[in-house]
Amino acid sequence: MLDVRKLLAQRPLLFDGGMGTYYKAKPGQECEQANLTDPEGILAVHRAYLAAGADAIKTNTFSLPRLAAAQQLGWEQLADAGWQLAAKAAGETGAAVFADLGPAPDTENLPAEQVYLAVAKRFALLGARNFLFETLSAEDGVLEAIRALKQTVPEAFVLVSFAVLPDGYTREGRYCAELVRRMAQSGVVDAVGLNCVSAPGAMRALVQQLGDAGLPLSVMPNAGYPVVARAQVRYQGKPEYFARELSRLAAEGVRILGGCCGTTPQHIAALRTALDALPEALPAAPAAKPAAAAKPAVETDDAFLRKLRTGQRVIAVELDSPKDADLTAYLEGARRLQAAGADLLTIADCPIARARMDSSLVACRVHRELGMNVLPHMTCRDRNLNATKALLLGLYAEGVREVLAITGDPIPTAERDEVKNVYQFNSRKLAQYIVSLAGEGREMPAPITVFGALNLNARNFEVELRRAAEKLENGMSGFLTQPVLSAQAVVNLKKTRETLGEKAKILAGIMPVVSQRNAIFMENEVNGIHVDAEIIERFAGLDRAQGEELGLEVSVKATQAAAPYADGFYLMTPFNRIALMERLIARLKKEGIAD
């Protein structure tokens, strides 16, 4: 069998092309199932690619990590059959075989690391020494699995390949240059590259951005972009164009080439011919594209962040956007809160999954008309990557420099036939994506500051704290907490400060209770809120005015208890009662609790 390392030292390595889009699986059947149900068909595909001139082929096992993560019975047999078929075909020509592993889902019950390692070890037992982890959108668990694999098989050659959109980001919002850098610096990855999603021309532009990765670089684009014809997805990229673009990459230093979706033996044969026509002496790595003159960073004069960073206690006030299309009363309420001394207006993103005026559009209007700092909430529930990026660019253009990244309340089960959850991100990955958009050559000259949510009332607060630490690692700057309406919430706030330190900016949540009915409702029907029984009892029999007075006193005491551990306060407006919030802000400033 071909020695991959020796070949790469001499010339570029040519992989096969797409399996799933070339082999037509039966409706409702995974392509990998054909390893057992149609072995001759899979063997014929391998042989066709080898006849086209491929130096290496992939096992027909792309979906195995997903099947293994689902603990689907029989994935081991699919691995065995996939390896045996590829090895049989490669044995006829002396080509290399790569055990092919697609993305593994990362769950709390079964981390991606364990899934990757289980599948890779299965292949290692069968004799695999070359491994391809491909079409990844993030590095979750893959490096840990490779380190463990190389303890068992130290001679293993491992190629890690990411699926990157033409703008340089994966579907999980990771920037390709950062992912490639992490692989190159890991010490356990032997080659790194890009595959799928993008067509040859776009992938060539991405490679020019990467430059010398420090490892052999791999490129396996799709044949083109998919079109739907007669209810079938087709790729119309021509073999001649595919070969021309990829042979240019080889001439520029890319050492591993092949194809992904839509590519066929005809594409690989054309590329083989083009590669064989290149001179023997080729660059060992691509040269970086000359950098354009760096644009000076444009920093917004952000009074809220400046005040927060200089140790003054800030006041953020949440005011839910309207349920209709009229912003008149909302803008008047925002003006009053600004005049009262609010440093920031926060706007929820369709709380409890009920549609309201878009939080980001409202934020832009408030910022434009009032010059007030705004913090629109941005959930992962309703937008995919494209919509999220488009919205962030619009916010930046409007001068909005802070967002609150949250996963978002799920849509009620009864409505899911008509309204769909998206959840392409979780809040940690969304934060990482937002931060990655800023930097030299990126979309934003200066970063948007990302805050997150922290539930002080979580039943398992240790888990909540671990997640908070992960959010900080992923680029968040601080947290807005759920309301402090219990003694335990204060204890947890203190623990948060001790655990996360001064780096995390914490705005303690304060939500005035205005009646016993209101308190009972929050305790029983609002996720993440706990109201001490003593507080509930104190509101018994009070009218509206009395309820507001008591709510004001309870809120002031909550801020006093939270103040030693908070950088400011996040005040939530109950039932649009602006006058109550004006009084609360005045009390906090008068008593020196907030600046």
Positions of predicted regions on the chain:
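Domain-level signal for soluble alpha/beta catalytic cores
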Residues: 1-595
